[in-house]
């Protein structure tokens, strides 16, 4: 049957007639090829593609028929469709400028097949082949933005944040021109994930937190975004930015539903965190967040050591490296190095006396510390009152009435 299709195509290519008549006859041959199965179908479709890219066929007809051809292929088995897509791209390549729209459609469908197979890199590379900026066809902003975001997401799935960042940067140039709110959300999600993968944790936390307030996003996804914001904040380097983010999250009552709330509370209240308290939280982290730093410690270990060092600076006026190392559960030399780095980067106030082996912390103002402690106490009292009202609403109502009557 494939031979019959090839013969019909050869005869039609040498015949004359109006574009409408010829297009109708080619369409009948395409329908016949689609009806076949297995190897016969594959060979017939390849013959059809060869005919369409032949220069003897009018460009008006071949574009129209290749568009129809593209609408049929998603209904075929993925293995057949994939082979036909690759064959078509290869045959079209010498005349790719004439078939830009059809090539874009083919690449989108082929990428979808690779995505179903979880072959993320090939899916991304197929989409990269669409000439969004360099081709003759003018693509609309939403199409370009959606494609760039999809490429970035696929590279993230393939654990390649460098390539993902390159395409999210291209998307960032377009996102202000788009009025599609759903695409804007996809952009923010993808950008937050790129920052997360690139270990820019505090920036990622800010993006995730912003997403957690978007009403267009489903409630469960908003809570998921809040969870990511919390995890990234915990993993971020200690300093003013992180302290502000900890305060923002601690005041957000939704965080009390999250498994990592206990760690958030300890960090916000400047309490020392021990290694054995982190096991449950460490298990929640994504693979890229479990990576090790240059000194061999994990990202989480480093973040907690820096947090504990800041907490120690609020407990002590000065401390020897040996005592500091024991407090942080690390060697004294490592404690000195981290303290030195944090002071140099302006993330902690103090100075180091290397002769005596002591780190001196600059005294903090008492008033802001008292304010923070009072704020924390009020927050805890509010939580208790809410729990009492949930458990005994009638008693709470009576108590409130009695209070108002006084």
Curated annotation (Swiss-Prot):
GO annotation terms (biological process): protein deneddylation
InterPro entries: CSN4_HTH (IPR041406), PCI_dom (IPR000717), PSMD12-CSN4-like_N (IPR054559), PSMD12/CSN4 (IPR040134), WH-like_DNA-bd_sf (IPR036388), WH_DNA-bd_sf (IPR036390)
Residues annotated as domain PCI: 197-366
Recorded GO CC terms: COP9 signalosome; nuclear speck; synaptic vesicle
Keyword Cytoplasm recorded: yes
Family matches, as Gene3D superfamilies: Winged helix-like DNA-binding domain superfamily/Winged helix DNA-binding domain (1.10.10.10)
PTM-bearing positions, type N-acetylalanine: 2
Signal peptide: none
Keywords: Acetylation, Cytoplasm, Cytoplasmic vesicle, Nucleus, Signalosome, Synapse
Chief localization: cytoplasm
Assembly mode: Component of the CSN complex, composed of COPS1/GPS1, COPS2, COPS3, COPS4, COPS5, COPS6, COPS7 (COPS7A or COPS7B), COPS8 and COPS9. In the complex, it probably interacts directly with COPS1, COPS2, COPS3, COPS5, COPS6, COPS7 (COPS7A or COPS7B) and COPS8. Interacts with TOR1A; the interaction is direct and associates TOR1A and SNAPIN with the CSN complex. Interacts with STON2; controls STON2 neddylation levels. Interacts with ERCC6.
Record-linked PANTHER family: 26S PROTEASOME NON-ATPASE REGULATORY SUBUNIT 12/COP9 SIGNALOSOME COMPLEX SUBUNIT 4, COP9 SIGNALOSOME COMPLEX SUBUNIT 4
Function: Component of the COP9 signalosome complex (CSN), a complex involved in various cellular and developmental processes. The CSN complex is an essential regulator of the ubiquitin (Ubl) conjugation pathway by mediating the deneddylation of the cullin subunits of SCF-type E3 ligase complexes, leading to decrease the Ubl ligase activity of SCF-type complexes such as SCF, CSA or DDB2. Also involved in the deneddylation of non-cullin subunits such as STON2.
Protein family (similarity comment): Belongs to the CSN4 family.
Protein name: COP9 signalosome complex subunit 4
Species of the source: Mus musculus (Mouse)
């Amino acid at each position: 049957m494939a031979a019959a299709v090839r013969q019909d195509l050869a005869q039609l290519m040498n015949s004359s007639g109006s574009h409408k008549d010829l297009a109708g006859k080619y369409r009948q041959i395409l329908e016949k090829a689609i009806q076949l199965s297995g190897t016969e179908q594959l060979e017939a479709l390849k013959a059809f593609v060869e005919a369409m890219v032949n220069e003897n066929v009018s460009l008006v007809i071949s574009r129209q028929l290749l568009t129809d051809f593209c609408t049929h292929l998603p209904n075929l088995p993925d293995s057949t469709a994939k082979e036909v897509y690759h064959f078509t791209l290869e045959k079209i390549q010498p005349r790719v400028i004439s078939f830009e729209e059809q090539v874009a459609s083919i690449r989108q469908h082929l990428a979808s097949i690779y995505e179903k197979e979880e072959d993320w890199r090939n899916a991304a590379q197929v989409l990269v082949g669409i000439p969004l900026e360099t081709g003759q066809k003018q693509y609309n902003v939403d199409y370009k933005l959606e494609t760039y975001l999809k490429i970035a997401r696929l590279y993230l799935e393939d654990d390649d944040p460098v390539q993902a960042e390159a395409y999210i940067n291209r998307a960032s140039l377009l996102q202000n021109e788009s009025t599609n709110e759903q695409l804007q959300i996809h952009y923010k999600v993808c950008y937050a994930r790129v920052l997360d993968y690139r270990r820019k944790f505090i920036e990622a936390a800010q993006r995730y937190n912003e997403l957690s307030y978007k009403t267009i996003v489903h409630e469960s996804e908003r809570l998921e975004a809040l969870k990511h914001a919390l995890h990234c904040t915990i993993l971020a380097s200690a300093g003013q930015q992180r302290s502000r983010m900890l305060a923002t999250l601690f005041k957000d009552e939704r965080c009390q539903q999250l498994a990592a709330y206990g760690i958030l509370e300890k960090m916000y209240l400047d309490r020392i965190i021990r290694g054995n308290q982190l096991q449950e939280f460490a298990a929640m982290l994504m693979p890229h967040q479990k990576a090790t730093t240059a000194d061999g410690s994990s990202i989480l270990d480093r973040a907690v050591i820096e947090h504990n060092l800041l907490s120690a600076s609020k407990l002590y006026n000065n401390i020897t490296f040996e005592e500091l190392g024991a407090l942080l559960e690390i060697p004294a030399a490592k404690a000195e190095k981290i303290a030195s780095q944090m002071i140099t980067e302006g993330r902690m106030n103090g100075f180091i006396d290397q002769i005596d082996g002591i780190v001196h912390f600059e005294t903090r103002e008492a008033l802001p510390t008292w304010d923070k402690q009072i704020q924390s106490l009020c927050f805890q009292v509010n939580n208790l009152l809410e729990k009492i009202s949930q458990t005994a609403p009638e008693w709470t109502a009576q108590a409130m009435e009695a209070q108002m009557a006084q």
